[in-house]
Amino acid sequence: MKVVAASRLIEAQIRYPSAHEHIQGWYQIMSNTDFHSPEDLRKVFGDMRGFNSSFKFPIPESKLLARTLINFAAQVVLIDDVVPGNH
């Protein structure tokens, strides 16, 4: 998928340095995989939550969530933010 606003991931890596590698790993999976449905996402990210085009992914080994908007037809994921929280 094409990851849009990846600069938000870089900002999160600066704000949360202990999660740097896990955020990078999440980005690598998203940018190198074609997901065609929420079910495809769940096969890889079992703990994610989603509704319509809005999806939240917990970042492993942290208390962070990547909040995204995904258009499966266009194969685009927009990074809304990476924030502390739970889903």
Identify the role of each PLM range.
Residues 1-63, 71-78, 82-87:
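Basic, Lys/Arg-enriched alpha-helical interface segments
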